Amino acid sequence: SSQSRGLGDVYKRQGLTDVEKAAERLADALTTNQRILIVGDYDADGATSVALCKLALTAMGAEQVDFLVPDRFQFGYGLSLEIVALAQSKSPDLIVTVDNGISSLEGVAAANELGIDVVITDHHLPGSELPPAYAIVNPNRRDCEFASKSMAGVGVAYYLMSWLRHTSVSYTHLTLPTTLVV
């Protein structure tokens, strides 16, 4: 049927602003054994995003990858100041947000002040100002030419992990299992 779609119909990674920069930062974290903290939202999209990134990064050799899925009613939504304080107790070198972060100006600034790089992956609509993150992967950025603007957060996380897997072939330090789907 005309509704039937296959893997050949998946959007290409090109045009997704900052995906290459984010993947390069993650590759650096992997090759230098840095501590990576994934911060997700506690809904289904956030939980699947966290699981995808944790599994993919571990499969690509990350030895120090942890995650945090805070209760938004206790800590607020996104990378809030409270969540940055909680994250600091895990001593990350890099925070990767999944399904949140696009409106976290104060939280990202606080993480930066602590010397923690932040990579944001999100699908929510950005405000007039973007957070001062190392990289922001969001198809709804005004400067993003990605083919789809209607993707869940886990889709954005998937494209980042896919780009990391694709570009990491040139990193001989990384063990890349052939069973990894991304």
Residue ranges and their predicted role:
Residues 11, 54, 158-161:
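Conserved protein kinase catalytic domain
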Residues 17-129, 136-137:
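N-terminal small/polar loop signature for handling phosphorylated ligands or for N-terminal nucleophile
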Residues 34, 130-174:
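A structured phosphate/pyrophosphate-recognition subdomain
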Residues 1, 43-48, 147-155:
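Short, conserved micro-motifs enriched in small and acidic residues
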Residues 1-11, 173-182:
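Single conserved hydrophobic/aromatic residue that forms the stacking wall/gate
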Residues 6, 78, 101, 153-155:
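Glycine-centered small-residue hotspots that permit tight backbone geometry or close packing
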